[in-house]
């Protein structure tokens, strides 16, 4: 009898050990940042991020092709065509994660050196003037098959290397400045996102505290605003890559989401734009099933759903459009003593005027923040954080503009830009 009791106790202990290994102890949230990356490796000068779930990612630093305040409608449509071509090049099993980062800085002349009195007085006049700087990164991620014991596949790895080089070439041919981050730069980029610090030379980490409304870190707080609520998709039926603003009684086109680069009280804003590329045949089959399910119950709401799905199927059949899953969010970082409600009101009012109602109950702040790490986009929930739409509509919600930076030239002439800070212009 004693032997049976000992065997039963040993079996229970073994079962508990297996359960802890497979499902954890319930404290995974405490170690959530440790479970993102496996390593960062250098592959022919390209820094490749490996996640612990088996995805590969390469990061390109790019410059958006549309000059801010250029008033050129065609350039916004050219951006849409370029990223549509990138999505078609990558195909099933890939994701595009574009991060536009806006940082409030204070002007400081970096060159130094001996100057004449007037030059010294000129730069001293602008010293400390606040302005918004921007940078843009594009991460290409290959999805890993979660059902396999060993996820490495040499053929898929070679396909990944080929596809990321094709993306780089397409961006260059489209007039977009792009280069791959190497191992050190990719590691630094991840660290800067983790600390939400894109302006200090030295990045320091600190403790995190996450609740249902914010993520706090040291002397700053972050709030993640998800753009689309999958339970209540309040989006306009027709969308363009630009919108019009009135300037001196004249309409001028600007980026559709240009409101995110001037959020009041915001110190840093990261606009995450993720496009997942699924199997097209499977998604069309699921759309057919969904349409039949709505058609089986005749009421006005179901009839509207059937008509919407039919229009989408017609566009796909006629114009060979691509179905994609998307996710858009904004990570807004402010000082710890700053009220975030002003940022919330600004975003709700600005997007509300465009017919877009941002989600009001994004209580999974930590999960959204972690899912927005470069290369970790597949950690976003398929059920709650991804929205099915056409690729053209998704790309319209991307940020397309760039601010002008000083040109690298030995002979510099300085002019002030629209933010009132000096820029070096090449006149050679």
Regions inferred by a protein language model and the residue ranges of each:
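Extended, folded cores of ATP/NTP-driven motor/assembly subunits in large transport
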Residues: 2-401
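Active-site-adjacent "gating/activation" loops or surface patches in catalytic cores
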Residues: 401-428
């Amino acid at each position: 009898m004693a032997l049976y009791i000992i065997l039963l106790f040993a079996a229970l202990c073994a079962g508990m050990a297996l359960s802890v290994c497979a499902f954890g102890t319930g404290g995974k949230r405490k170690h959530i940042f440790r479970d993102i990356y496996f390593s960062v490796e250098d592959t022919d000068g390209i820094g490749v991020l490996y996640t612990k779930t088996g995805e590969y990612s390469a990061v390109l630093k790019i410059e958006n092709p549309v000059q801010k305040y250029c008033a050129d409608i065609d350039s916004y449509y050219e951006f849409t065509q370029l990223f549509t071509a990138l999505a078609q090049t990558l195909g099933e099993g890939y994701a595009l994660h574009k991060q536009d980062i806006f940082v409030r800085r204070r002007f400081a002349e970096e060159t130094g050196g001996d100057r004449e009195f007037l030059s010294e007085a000129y730069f001293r006049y602008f010293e400390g003037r606040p302005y918004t700087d921007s940078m843009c990164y594009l991460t290409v991620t290959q999805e890993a098959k979660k059902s396999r014991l060993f996820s490495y596949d040499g053929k898929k790895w070679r396909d990944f290397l080929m596809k990321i080089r094709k993306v780089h070439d397409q961006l260059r041919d489209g007039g977009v400045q792009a280069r791959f981050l190497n191992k050190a730069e990719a590691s630094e980029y991840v660290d800067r996102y983790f600390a939400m610090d894109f302006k200090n030379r030295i990045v320091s980490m600190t403790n995190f505290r996450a609740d249902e409304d914010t993520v706090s870190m040291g002397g700053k707080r972050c709030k993640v605003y998800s753009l689309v609520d999958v339970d209540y998709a309040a989006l306009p039926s027709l969308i363009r890559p630009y919108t019009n603003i009135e300037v001196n009684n004249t309409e001028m086109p600007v980026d559709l989401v240009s409101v995110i680069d001037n959020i009041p009280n915001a110190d840093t804003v990261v606009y995450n734009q993720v496009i997942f590329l699924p199997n097209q045949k499977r998604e069309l089959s699921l759309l057919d099933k969904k349409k039949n399910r709505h058609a089986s119950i005749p009421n006005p709401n179901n009839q509207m759903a059937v008509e919407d799905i039919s229009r989408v199927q017609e566009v796909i059949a006629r114009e060979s459009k691509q179905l994609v899953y998307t996710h858009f969010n904004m990570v807004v970082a402010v000082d710890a003593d700053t009220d975030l409600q002003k940022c919330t009101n600004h975003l709700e009012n600005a997007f509300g005027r465009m017919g877009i109602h941002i989600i009001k109950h994004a209580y999974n702040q930590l999960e959204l923040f972690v899912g927005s790490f470069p290369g970790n986009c597949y950690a976003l929930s398929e059920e709650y954080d991804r929205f099915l739409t056409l690729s053209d509509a998704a790309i319209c919600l991307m940020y397309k503009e760039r601010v002008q930076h000083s040109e690298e030239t030995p002979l510099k002439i300085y002019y002030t830009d629209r933010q009132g800070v000096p820029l070096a212009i090449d006149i050679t």
